[in-house]
Amino acid sequence: MKKLLLTLAMVPAVLFSPTAWGDATDDLLGRLQTLESMKGGFEQVVLDQSGTHMQEALGKFQVARGNRFYWLTETPYEQMAASDGTTVWVYDKDLEQVVVRPLSQDLGQTPALLFGGKPADVAKAFTISERDNRGAEVTYRLTPKGQDPLFDQLDVTFKGGQPASMRLQDALGQQTVIDFIGLTLNDGIDSSLFHFDPPEGTDVIQQQQ
């Protein structure tokens, strides 16, 4: 069950006209273009096909341009994922183990890069449509174009111009819902968190992409 916590860090498809698709893409990319960095807390819930809660988690995160991110799950147990834009570290404190691997540039494999990568790459990686628009609250649906993505679809919601939540659905219908809390945009990033030096005695597992 632990692997569910770090899904960074899941309704029938609606058909959109080419004009609507283009508008949604331009609108989302315009929002992402203003984000140089983002940090805050998160609440994460994993749901099965029937909507039953399988797991809940709380933590904090930060992402920044250059494909850099830091994602710390604090409860129910501590796990951390970080990237300096080249390397990813996934650390399990209880197991005293860290997995080290190259960062995949595939946004379908690394959802955190939606906010930390180049906005233009988002349009290349996803088919984008506007799923819901309530004025101050807008939800975009992103469907991966690549092969073997981590998820089948990703809904990202903005409220008052800020990212508010993400909902990922996999091929089995399992959903991961992430609500962002107390966001700070474009300020206050601790760049040292994007690199991880394992504590002495940690088992280091090197993986190739």
Swiss-Prot record:
Q: Which domain of life is it from?
A: Bacteria
InterPro entries attached to this UniProt entry: LolA/LolB/LppX, OM_lipoprot_carrier_LolA-like, OM_lipoprot_carrier_LolA_Pbac
Q: Where in the cell is it found?
A: Periplasm
Gene Ontology terms: biological process: lipoprotein localization to outer membrane; lipoprotein transport
Q: Which family does the UniProt entry place this protein in?
A: Belongs to the LolA family.
- The residues the entry assigns to the signal sequence are 1-22
Q: Identify the CDD domains for this entry.
A: LolA
Return the protein name: Outer-membrane lipoprotein carrier protein
Quaternary structure per UniProt?
Monomer.
Transport found in the keyword field: yes
UniProt cross-references to Pfam families, sorted A to Z:
LolA (PF03548)
Q: Which GO terms describe its cellular component?
A: outer membrane-bounded periplasmic space
Query: Predominant location of this chain?
Result: periplasm
Entry function: Participates in the translocation of lipoproteins from the inner membrane to the outer membrane. Only forms a complex with a lipoprotein if the residue after the N-terminal Cys is not an aspartate (The Asp acts as a targeting signal to indicate that the lipoprotein should stay in the inner membrane).
User: What UniProt keywords apply to this chain's record, in alphabetical order?
Assistant: Chaperone, Periplasm, Protein transport, Signal, Transport
